[in-house]
From Swiss-Prot:
Originating species: Arabidopsis thaliana
Disulphide bonds in the chain: C33-C109, C66-C71, C115-C309, C192-C224
Function: Removal of H(2)O(2), oxidation of toxic reductants, biosynthesis and degradation of lignin, suberization, auxin catabolism, response to environmental stresses such as wounding, pathogen attack and oxidative stress. These functions might be dependent on each isozyme/isoform in each plant tissue.
Span of the signal peptide: 1-22
Protein name: Peroxidase 57
Residues binding Ca(2+) 1, per UniProt: D65, V68, G70, D72, S74
Top EC class for this record: oxidoreductase
Amino-acid positions noted as binding Ca(2+) 2 in the UniProt annotation, renumbered to this chain: T186, D233, S236, D241
Listed InterPro entries: Haem_peroxidase (IPR002016), Haem_peroxidase_sf (IPR010255), Peroxidase_pln (IPR000823), Peroxidases_AS (IPR019794), Peroxidases_heam-ligand_BS (IPR019793), Secretory_peroxidase (IPR033905)
Cellular localization per UniProt: Secreted
Requisite cofactors: heme b; Ca(2+)
Alphabetic keyword roster: Calcium, Disulfide bond, Heme, Hydrogen peroxide, Iron, Metal-binding, Oxidoreductase, Peroxidase, Secreted, Signal
Amino acid sequence: MMKGAKFSSLLVLFFIFPIAFAQLRVGFYSQSCPQAETIVRNLVRQRFGVTPTVTAALLRMHFHDCFVKGCDASLLIDSTNSEKTAGPNGSVREFDLIDRIKAQLEAACPSTVSCADIVTLATRDSVALAGGPSYSIPTGRRDGRVSNNLDVTLPGPTISVSGAVSLFTNKGMNTFDAVALLGAHTVGQGNCGLFSDRITSFQGTGRPDPSMDPALVTSLRNTCRNSATAALDQSSPLRFDNQFFKQIRKRRGVLQVDQRLASDPQTRGIVARYANNNAFFKRQFVRAMVKMGAVDVLTGRNGEIRRNCRRFN
């Protein structure tokens, strides 16, 4: 039944992204590098055992890569003006994990598995390790040959709900997808500077944001006295579940855009459905991740298969 459900979901997505899915497929490396997904999974599992926050880090990396020129690993390039140097990418980490995975794959199957697919697969595996869904995802992406920090225009935490949703709909997704992907904040961490005004002087009023639970204000103040970051899901910060949605319905959203999801007419009904049904949220999250993983991908003879994820060939 599960295999049929996965096939059905991918069939629907094929018609949504016909060009991308024409050359992406589940098991793309089954002949050329049959151990590829096992190598990725084992190294991610090792990292997760030491640093459970790897899930949040890889989700952030995958999102930031896909939403700038597509899922092409352009974020991984080291240079003085690459995407990696742009302000919004300053908090992206776990590049060293991608390097280790790439090194093992190159030893096993030289010039075969793209860095773009490594990021996609590693993110998928880290979500499952954190208690999220296990799912199949198409592979066959190729790596981009361009990485420019001027192309990075990712939104900040005060973006409106309509603005956030439009980022996803402009990429071929819908509102359910947008809210599901923002639900990845269930394992996220936020720099205290991103919400400091909400707990001190909201919009220059000298008082905290009235839409935030006062108990959360106090808790975040204490956290930010001793740490530069705070969990975006204060209930189960290392567990991939629907607690994030339950929290924002209780006025316990840490980022302003997260809290707005629970009250905006465009998204509050979806938030309620995800909060009330963890299985439904996880199914929708899988659909959204597969869609996002097909955004503006390079396939066939386009792009390249990098030998080192930090450098163009």
